[in-house]
Amino acid sequence: MKDELFKQSPKKQFEFDKSVASVFDDMINRSVPFYRENLELCGNLLAKILSTNASVCDLGCSSANFLIFLANLRKDFKLFGVDNSASMLEVAKSKAKAYGLDISFFEANLCEFDFFVCDVFVANYTMQFIRPPKRQELLDKIYKNLNSKGILIMSEKILYEDAFLSKNIIELYADYKEKQGYSKFEIAAKREALENVLIPYSQKENLNMLEKAGFKKIESIFKWANFETFIAFKD
């Protein structure tokens, strides 16, 4: 379904409810620049470097796009998805079933989730929705539950520290969304709904959190304007 949720002024803060879940795939493909290309980059990289029967857990898996792509690349992977939205998981499970894929899903708040050890954790556009006081604690848990040589892939919308640059990048991003078919009204309405829900950090703040969690080898593998993907390795 086409995302037309914000053709009217929002009556509440943004949440991943049934209305969002029903249009999520269209929404994210039109709202996150190079979403599919970045998803495929990360998936192909993991398929190339991970050992047989590696375990991958997608934290904030939404409609399971990444897990489904990964499952079709490597049949041996053990795949898990966690999300706090029952509506999103309903879509994820339905899609996985349609593809005949064996993916385990958990409905949970990530800050309260009973983590298990994995080779890879993925958090694509997830941390930005976690309340700031809880983010470091969550990253600490992720690091602790990674196997030796484990990997974290983390994609985030980011802030620029320079105010002039930040203003212009934000305007370019709005231009991008207009080119994807969103009106100025829709863009402003969604921004209003996301206020104090999606709270981005700067690149430096994200790197500092990763380092504080224990990661020593961290690289940026994708960036477009105010969107960036980090890969971090556990020693």
Curated annotation (Swiss-Prot):
CDD domains: AdoMet_MTases (cd02440). It comes from the Bacteria. Disulfide bonds: none annotated. S-adenosyl-L-methionine binds at Y35, G60, C61, S62, D83, N84, N124, R191. It catalyses: prephenate + S-adenosyl-L-methionine = carboxy-S-adenosyl-L-methionine + 3-phenylpyruvate + H2O. Its EC number is 2.1.3.-. One of its GO terms (molecular function) is S-adenosyl-L-methionine binding. Catalyzes the conversion of S-adenosyl-L-methionine (SAM) to carboxy-S-adenosyl-L-methionine (Cx-SAM). Homodimer. NCBIfam families: carboxy-S-adenosyl-L-methionine synthase CmoA. Belongs to the class I-like SAM-binding methyltransferase superfamily. Cx-SAM synthase family. This is Carboxy-S-adenosyl-L-methionine synthase. It comes from Campylobacter jejuni subsp. jejuni serotype O:23/36 (strain 81-176).
